[in-house]
């Protein structure tokens, strides 16, 4: 056990409420019953908490990342929509994703030969490995998984035409992850992809974080020929969430529901909880208010740009408390 990790104590097991702001004006709370583990790594604060609703959940710098009960709401559309669109991914890169859930879903493809997990913080992997087996499901023991500890941007920049699929499974765009949300980094991802390769990432919420969502899409569209945003409600995130798939040629809108279901069956993916041929197109079918949002001018994000006006960092919100009446 790391000296910076503390085990549960009687005081940490008392019922509590974790409050997470989504904007300066809105947030949500989640009841927690036990602090299972906690570390202050060199780059961030990591917690594993027990919750009645979601089971074990991971928080990083005050933001919920994943949980045992609802991880599929995030991991399945993030991985399988682009993978099925590609058709036969064999080499994949995950930037971030230290909980192992994305790697597990990629490794489910029988033709997958290699998955590289580039994670900045070894403590995230260690804590997930110990406390979240229902999320990673043994992915860290798969011989096809290759761990790279360190700067994911630097690693990606040294790759060229190596990967069929890249998944940016990142924390929110503040703190150590900020440099992974720029047009410059997306250019590095494009160079790292093979022809026909696919990229996916989450792009925040169209409801409470629409300015950053619009700018992220503008950044992607300046680099890739095909960019398709899609939507999924993630219970642990407290709101409607957005993701995007980008490629030079592969287009998720080109496949029928029948073709998608056939590819899922061919890969033995018959037990998914969310993603299917039917939900594929539902995810991509944006409501009018989102289409309007994305039709408005937005500026790409470049290295050195300040995102202070978007005000995403919950650490800047001050001490929040839940007031019960």
Curated annotation (Swiss-Prot):
- UniProt EC number: 2.5.1.16
One GO BP annotation of this record: spermidine biosynthetic process
Its encoding gene is what?
speE
Q: Can you name one GO molecular function term for this protein?
A: spermidine synthase activity
Record-linked SUPFAM superfamilies? S-adenosyl-L-methionine-dependent methyltransferases
Question: Any keyword Transferase?
Answer: yes
Give me the Gene Ontology terms describing cellular component.
Answer: cytoplasm
Q: What is its main location?
A: cytoplasm
| Domain PABS: start-end pairs | 11-248
Q: Which Pfam families match?
A: Spermine_synt_N (PF17284), Spermine_synth (PF01564)
InterPro entries per UniProt = PABS, SAM-dependent_MTases_sf, Spermi_synthase, Spermidine_synt_N, Spermidine_synt_N_sf
Q: What protein am I looking at? A: Polyamine aminopropyltransferase
Q: HAMAP family recorded for this chain?
A: Spermidine_synth
Q: Which organism is it from?
A: Nitrosomonas europaea (strain ATCC 19718 / CIP 103999 / KCTC 2705 / NBRC 14298)
